[in-house]
Amino acid sequence: MKAILSSDRKWGLGYQGRLLVSIPSDLRFFRETTMGHVVVMGRKTLATLPAGQPLKGRTNIILSRDPEWTVRGATVVHSIKELMEVLKPYEDDDIYVAGGGEIYRQLLPYCDTAYVTRIDMTYQADTFFEDLDESPDWEMVEEGDE
């Protein structure tokens, strides 16, 4: 399983339910990287997507605490245990965790790779990712050009 995200210098992810900044090249990287794969996200993250709809060309799995909530074009699960059952048929390399903050916190222990676009600025944020720079469990193995 892989996490995919963009964060500011202080590992900020978002503010008031939105990304801190929209970077076209990062959005393109996200699209190209996740296309044809499984994308796991929370209900609130789904709501921030265009028209609040699942991502086209991907298998969308949405985590929601609301047992009555459904969305067309995605599989909805209500617990990590249920998510793991739904993910059994897929290879770990085909699964991308796309947020939000609570979903990252719950699933980071299952991830072996994190694609992180670090924005060299600090923004007002109310949602954060774990500081991988300070985590002994993570190391940077490759750094991009941008």
Label for each model-derived stretch:
Residues M1-E146:
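Enzymes that bind and transform nitrogen-containing heteroaromatic metabolites
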